[in-house]
Amino acid sequence: MNASIIIPTYNEADLLPGLLGDLKAQRGADFELIVADADSTDTTRDVARASGARVVDGGMPAVGRNAGARVANGDILIFLDADVRVPRTFVRRAVAEMKTRELAAGTCPARPISKLTTDRIIHNFANLFIRMNQRSDPHAAGYCLLVRKDAFDRIGGFDESLKVAEDHDLVSRVSEIGPFRMLDSTFVRVSVRRYQKEGRIAYALKAIKIGLYRAAVGEITEDSSVVDYDFGDFSEDDARGSRRVLRQIERGLIKLDRQTSRLDERVIKGNEQRPGAYDQWQRASQSLREAWDALFDSEPDGENAPERHSDR
């Protein structure tokens, strides 16, 4: 068997059928499907079993993914979140590229399931960040993560003591025994419901905070109060307030998107060493700084507008 697809779930009866339908429609792919469920209170387990998936007991994402991996028979483990969508050729192309490039681990570009230009820009920049750092500081979001089974077992799987960023930690450790790269042949479409719950700006700031803490202090464990994370909790929605602010900074972010898209194309072609690529990265960084300044220099109306705080 070429691959084992492992999906950690908690109360995903509404969105899981979309992904299961995509997987059922896969062409030319040999894989098994495993759902690791964290004791859902809805019909998630019934939905999974009806699709032919093997259901095992899960928990937090790292726990669920490890539980699925323990019973997996595939040479390549493909970890997907329950709310993603994949093209019909996803499994075949992903597995083929992993084998052709002899990768130990990989991820793939993300496209948001959203009509907001801002969401597209955010994901374009995130994709570029992963590509630019795939050799020196590997990152991979858990919504799409591929790992050779032998490499996964060798490093002991996901660190279940971590509260967040267990996906980044995993690919960092895997990269010590084999290459990690972003795949070029396929992609996933990802939900923006976490943005909608926490707000785009708040979510971005949380991501920055996590990155800085990991770089300066270390991994964030379950008993840490550095950030909050509630697996499967999407009950709140403050997207309306976020939209008001985002419309005002969108023009600045579009400038950034043009730069990052051009550079991303160069990285894909393997032209990272060209001086022109470095110069373009510098311009993209400058555009990001300008967009950030525009965010805090704007004066949005309405009670949901964020206040600017200064430590000075």
Regions found by a protein language model. Give the residues of each.
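A recurrent flexible, glycine/aromatic-enriched loop bordering the glycosyltransferase active site
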Residues: 110-117, 128-150
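Short aromatic/hydrophobic "clamp" motif used to bind/position activated sugar donors
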Residues: 77
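Short, acidic, metal-binding catalytic loop of nucleotide-sugar glycosyltransferases
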Residues: 21-30
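A conserved acidic beta->alpha catalytic loop
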Residues: 22, 37-45, 84
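Acidic donor-binding/catalytic loop of UDP-sugar-dependent glycosyltransferases
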Residues: 43, 80-96, 172
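Conserved donor NDP-sugar-binding/catalytic core segment of glycosyltransferases
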Residues: 89-118
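Acidic donor-binding loop at a coil-to-helix junction in glycosyltransferase catalytic cores
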Residues: 164-170
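Glycine-rich, basic loop-to-helix element that forms the pyrophosphate-binding segment
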Residues: 57-72
